[in-house]
Amino acid sequence: MSLAVVTLKKGEGRLLKSGGMWIFDNEIATIMGSFVNGDIVLIHDFDGYPLGRGFINTNSKITVRLLTRDENQKIDEEFLEKRVRDAWEYRKKVTDTSSCRMIFGEADFLPGLVVDKFEDVLVVQSLALGIDRLKNTILELLKKVLAEDGIQIRGIYERSDAKVRKQEGMELYKGFIGPEFPTLVEIVENGVKYQVDIKDGQKTGFFLDQKYNRLAIQKLCKDARVLDCFTHTGSFALNAGIAGAKEVTGVDASQLAVDQATENAKLNGLDDKVKFICEDVFELLPKLEEEGEKYDVVILDPPAFTKSRSSVKNAVKGYREINLRGLKLVKDGGFLATCSCSHFMEYELFTKTIGQAARSAHKRLRQVEYRTQAPDHPILWASDESYYLKFYIFQVCDEK
């Protein structure tokens, strides 16, 4: 059966030709041939030049997601195994693989698919209709490739409950793939133990992208008084604790997250000096300032304040406010670790916003380092959506 052909409008396809992976609905001139959403299609530019193969979904603004630039490449099990094997071999070279992101969508050339490995458990998230059809085959291939390295996967859980699926015309879903198993999974990262709730935790249960950023703050925290804002399940706070901080306070608005963080502190024998409170950070920080509290290290790891270009302006206000409040709580010569996990809060804008907050707080910033996401979340150049995490460490000085 011949594949349908998607032909782009004249002058369109520049992003695709320069390394991008997406074709938007407004770039398409015609679709010739029969198809159902989720099918593999051929992609041509306006002049008929072949650009590759991808899967189509006319319900989505991202109408075609590229799978290969070779128009003659069959999308079969052999093709998928090569993708899976390449992804695993890459991670073995660049990161600790006991717990890691095994598949990172477009950056691993499997668009719309996320797979996290937590020890001997896989958590999968499918965000595109076409990859949904291939998901089970890919998971079997992942188990095969891992088994070759002596890693037996005891269970798979699906967390396809992200709202973005609705933009693909897909239902939200979460549940077991195969036999059921306990959904609290213990992992060790940077010497810290965690209980990861893969069923009810945020996203896939744990934010693996901050792995080496958490490690980076350890050297600042010995004998320090530390405030960790938006702590989630306590990862930055616990890294501070294990590094020898004398007192750590973690703050989160979710009681579930605070309860999990408290259990994680007990798991590491740190519950005597690492404490967690359930508070709204935006309300708490002004109170701490009024009370004259000061910290050696303040960590700001907020959720994404914007998930679209249209809400960036409001997000800037949020980032400016939280950094202003955080800076005012840092002792002269202390440190601020601050980040944004929103793709739409671009590096230049985030940097500018922190600078504005520092001026308003009458603080001078000395940059210690700039970091981004862990290498198991690779940044694919020309695929801007793969670069989202911005992470700064500053020394904070009073104006002199």
Regions found by a protein language model. Give the residues of each.
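A short, charged
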Residues: 78, 82, 86-90, 94, ...
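Non-catalytic substrate-recognition/targeting regions of SAM-dependent transferases
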Residues: 103-116, 135-206, 215
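Short, surface-exposed beta-strand-loop junctions and turns on beta-sheet-rich folds
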Residues: 60, 130-132, 202-203
